[in-house]
Regions:
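PP2C/PPM-type serine/threonine phosphatase catalytic domain
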Residues: 1-220
């Protein structure tokens, strides 16, 4: 299995608040991305914490005797644990009070794609077409779901970056879990630092036209 990963501060921020982890094991291959928020490096702290906590939780609790539904529940509990730890850390450290982060994970296990997410960092599945697996927890996505605006209007909405769910924002969190068949597609996980500037079809083109996923990630 081939992996590629990169994080870049870009031209619009002074601090890179994104973090990621890739687990390249044959048994439980997965990747997680996080996009922090909170200012004064608090977002960077939150995204780093969520990635580390999820990694540690999964390392301790994933087992090959689990079926894919049970593995999904282990992932959910990893997110819930991370949320609680980040929330309490922020509450007790005034310099990072109010910090939070998105978190999106995708794992391939037993020929299934298991995804978990909170916030608006996305997971895509790329085969002949590109398909967004996750559904943004954002203000504009709620407007789209209610039919009040179109997906095209959402791209330029003044509140397009307002998220409605974040890790560490409250003492509890609802984690969306999805399980889909895996048929050899390429999975892409990314923060809005990519999707705010690159169209879905462009992402697909970069991925499909490159044999090396690391080069694809770096060019995107």
């Amino acid at each position: 299995m081939q992996f590629g990963a990169v994080t870049d501060i870009g031209m619009h921020r002074k601090i890179n608040e994104d973090n990621y982890y890739v687990n390249e094991s044959d048994t439980f291959p997965y990747a997680v991305v996080a996009d922090g928020m909170g200012g004064h490096q608090a977002g960077e702290v939150a995204s780093m914490m969520v990635v580390d906590i999820i990694e540690n939780h999964l390392e301790k609790n994933l087992d090959t005797e689990l079926d894919y539904v049970e593995a999904g529940e282990v992932i959910r509990q990893a997110f819930i644990s991370a949320n609680s730890i980040i929330y309490n850390y922020a509450k007790n450290h005034y310099k990072v009070m109010g910090m939070g982060t998105t978190a999106t994970l995708a794992m391939i296990y037993q020929n299934k794609i298991i995804t978990a997410h909170v916030g608006d960092s996305r997971a895509y599945m790329i085969g002949d077409e590109i398909k967004q697996i996750t559904k943004d927890h954002s203000y504009v996505q709620e407007l789209v779901s209610r039919g009040e605006i179109s997906p095209e209007m959402a791209k330029n909405h003044p509140k397009k970056n307002y998220i409605t769910r974040a890790m560490g924002a409250e003492d509890t969190v609802k984690v969306d879990i999805s399980i889909k068949p895996y048929n050899g597609e390429t999975l892409v996980l990314c923060s809005d630092g990519l999707t705010n500037f690159v169209e879905d079809d462009e992402i697909r083109t970069y991925i499909k036209n490159k044999s090396n996923l690391q080069k694809s990630a770096e060019e995107l």
